[in-house]
Amino acid sequence: MPELPEVETSLRGVEPYLHGKIIKQIVVRTQKLRWAVSDELQHMQGAKIVALSRRAKYLILHTTQGDILIHLGMSGSLGILQENQQPAGKHDHVDLITQDGMVLRYNDPRKFGCWLWTKNAEQHELITRLGPEPLSESFTAAYLFARSRNKTVAVKNFIMNNDIVVGVGNIYACESLFMAELHPELAAQNLTEKQCERLVKVIKEVLAKAIIQGGTTLKDFIQPDGKPGYFAQVLQVYGRKDEACNDCGTIIEAKVIGQRNSYFCPHCQMLPR
């Protein structure tokens, strides 16, 4: 699933081609993704794209006729091409075409993403309920420690909760907990202030590094220029079940926590008794 670094990579990849451009047409080939594609999108001819931004895993196109919320879902990706350069494929569900002939193409084999119109993205219910951005100054050790009090949930599920902090998906949660030397099943309420300092620090480091690497390609995700994300080449625990830990040589284990596969080193990430 594309996570925060993949969406940030997509934003940076498409922004130079779309910022300031006028929408000629939005072609919708599939009316139902995770939710129904907003009808308003097909009536945005002449709208100017005045800015692009990201909130959590949502890419937002701010236009003179409202905002477009895009989510990549489980398997989505965005590509930039010239109009009439390449016929749409089976999984190419939406094309945003600009007056100068650029095409933003949305591909999603599993059809679990979304394209929604809203008057103001900041006031949309999908956005207003979100926690702080992990790379922002508001995501601090003091904040995380305060939110963790009386939380019996596993720390891995805790940091993946978008009400607590956005964009820390499964891959980056596993990697961050490894770097912080925290077992994924440790109860959030048992985190110390020092552990929260370390965890916040490594979450920021892991996500920043992943963005530099263009995200993580495990199956479907590709960057707008067609290249894969290279962070997969430096994963320490995620997807490495039965392989040796790079730090201590202990065999990496996997366990389902919160309905997701979790990867950890039982030696580097010991669960306190």
From Swiss-Prot:
PROSITE patterns in alphabetical order: FPG_CAT (PS51068), ZF_FPG_1 (PS01242), ZF_FPG_2 (PS51066)
Domain of life of the source: Bacteria
Intrachain S-S bonds: none
Name of one Pfam family that matches: H2TH
Annotated Gene3D superfamilies: 1.10.8.50, MutM-like, N-terminal (3.20.190.10)
Residues the record marks as active site: P2, E3, K57, R260
Entry-linked InterPro entries: DNA_glyclase/AP_lyase_DNA-bd, DNA_glyclase_Znf_dom_DNA_BS, Formamido-pyr_DNA_Glyclase, FPG_cat, MutM-like_N-ter, Ribosomal_uS13-like_H2TH, Znf_DNA_glyclase/AP_lyase, Znf_FPG/IleRS
Gene Ontology terms: biological process: base-excision repair
Residues noted as binding DNA in the record, renumbered to the chain: H91, R110, K151
Entry keyword set: DNA damage, DNA repair, DNA-binding, Glycosidase, Hydrolase, Lyase, Metal-binding, Multifunctional enzyme, Zinc, Zinc-finger
Listed EC numbers: 3.2.2.23, 4.2.99.18
Subunit structure: Monomer.
The protein's role, per its UniProt record: Involved in base excision repair of DNA damaged by oxidation or by mutagenic agents. Acts as a DNA glycosylase that recognizes and removes damaged bases. Has a preference for oxidized purines, such as 7,8-dihydro-8-oxoguanine (8-oxoG). Has AP (apurinic/apyrimidinic) lyase activity and introduces nicks in the DNA strand. Cleaves the DNA backbone by beta-delta elimination to generate a single-strand break at the site of the removed base with both 3'- and 5'-phosphates.
Similarity comment text for this entry: Belongs to the FPG family.
Name of the protein in its database record: Formamidopyrimidine-DNA glycosylase
Source species of the chain: Actinobacillus pleuropneumoniae serotype 5b (strain L20)
Organism taxonomic ancestry: Bacteria, Pseudomonadati, Pseudomonadota, Gammaproteobacteria, Pasteurellales
Gene that encodes the chain: mutM
